[in-house]
Amino acid sequence: MKVLLIKDVKALGKAGEIKEVKDGYGQNFLIAKGFAKAATNEVLRKYESDKKKEAENLRFEIANLEKLKEELSKITLEISKPVGANGSLFGGVTKDEIAHALKEQSHIEIDKKSLECDTLKSLGIHEVSVKLGHAIHAKFNINIKAE
């Protein structure tokens, strides 16, 4: 019996593979537990069409992330913070503040967990990197000024 694996099965194969198994193992275990479907022509056609749709969605998502990367590379955020008598910042600029400033000034919403920087503790221009997903990284500048 041929089955299309829906989930990874230890010692048999990974999801998406077509395997030849004994009838009892296929019917009573793999199909019954939801690990596989019988590899009929209809199931295989549906699987292929779903795979094509998924690939198209992935291309669309990557194209959108590339556009976002391009937008971010042109941005310089302005953040004002109070400074002490010697010109050093009180505290610093955190990832949360950077994400909030990006949303307020550029209307781009980024999760603070995707920002790759430590707390910025000095005045001036700093470069911040962002993980957008699908191995796409973007960089933008932040200008920290004294209040």
UniProtKB/Swiss-Prot annotation:
State a single Pfam family of this protein: Ribosomal_L9_N
Q: Name the GO terms of the biological process aspect.
A: translation
Extract the InterPro entries matched here: Ribosomal_bL9 (IPR000244), Ribosomal_bL9/RNase_H1_N (IPR009027), Ribosomal_bL9_bac/chp (IPR020594), Ribosomal_bL9_C (IPR020069), Ribosomal_bL9_C_sf (IPR036791), Ribosomal_bL9_N (IPR020070), Ribosomal_bL9_N_sf (IPR036935)
Q: Which family does it belong to?
A: Belongs to the bacterial ribosomal protein bL9 family.
Does the entry feature the keyword RNA-binding, yes or no?
yes
Q: Which organism is it from?
A: Campylobacter jejuni subsp. jejuni serotype O:2 (strain ATCC 700819 / NCTC 11168)
Q: Which UniProt keywords apply?
A: Ribonucleoprotein, Ribosomal protein, RNA-binding, rRNA-binding
Q: What is this protein called?
A: Large ribosomal subunit protein bL9
Q: Name one GO cellular component term.
A: ribosome
Q: Which domain of life is it from?
A: Bacteria
Provide the GO MF annotations for this entry.
rRNA binding; structural constituent of ribosome
Q: Which HAMAP family match?
A: Ribosomal_bL9 (MF_00503)
Q: Where would one find coiled-coil regions in this protein?
A: none
Q: What's its job?
A: Binds to the 23S rRNA.
Q: State which gene encodes it.
A: rplI
- Record PROSITE patterns: RIBOSOMAL_L9 (PS00651)
